[in-house]
């Protein structure tokens, strides 16, 4: 029987030919698809939100201010125009984001935001699951109160 390590070959430092200003965020959202189960158009909108957030974070250090600017009507309009969707369709997508926990308290759910060094040179991904119960998909938030 062949050793399993011979079957799986992973480069220790894979080089991705993309930048945070390019398609990186679209690939990131696609990578996280099992967690959010968004449609292609919804993933495009989320990727654009993440890209704009990253670019804003280069100049705005305060995260509360960053989130306020990101969720401002002007920024949303720019994202909608970049994605080429109508205002009505954009509102439907935003409602779904809120319902499914992608946006919580007018902020993008922190676990969906990639942790990128300020110079954009390094992205760290760390998965740690002790049991199956810790692997929670995004979805409607359930209240902890009993009726």
Task: For each feature predicted by the language model, list its residue ranges.
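Eukaryotic partner-binding/assembly regions in large regulatory complexes
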Residues: 1-12, 113, 117-126
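Short helix-coil junctions and helix-kink-helix linkers
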Residues: 69-87
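A short, conserved structural fragment
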Residues: 85, 90-112
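Short, amphipathic alpha-helical interaction segments positioned at domain boundaries
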Residues: 117-147
């Amino acid at each position: 029987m062949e050793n399993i390590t011979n079957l799986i070959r992973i480069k220790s430092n894979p080089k991705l030919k993309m930048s945070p200003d390019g398609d990186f965020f679209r690939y990131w959202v696609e990578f996280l698809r099992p967690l959010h189960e968004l449609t292609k158009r919804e993933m495009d909108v989320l990727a654009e939100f993440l890209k704009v957030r990253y670019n804003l974070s280069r100049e705005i250090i305060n995260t509360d201010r960053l989130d306020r600017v990101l969720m401002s009507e002007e920024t949303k309009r720019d994202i909608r125009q970049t994605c080429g969707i109508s205002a009505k369709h954009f509102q439907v997508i935003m409602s779904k984001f809120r319902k499914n926990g992608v946006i919580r308290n007018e902020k993008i759910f922190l676990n969906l935001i990639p942790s990128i060094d300020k110079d954009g040179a390094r992205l760290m991904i760390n998965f740690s699951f002790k049991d199956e119960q810790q692997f929670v998909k995004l979805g409607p938030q359930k209240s902890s109160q009993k009726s």
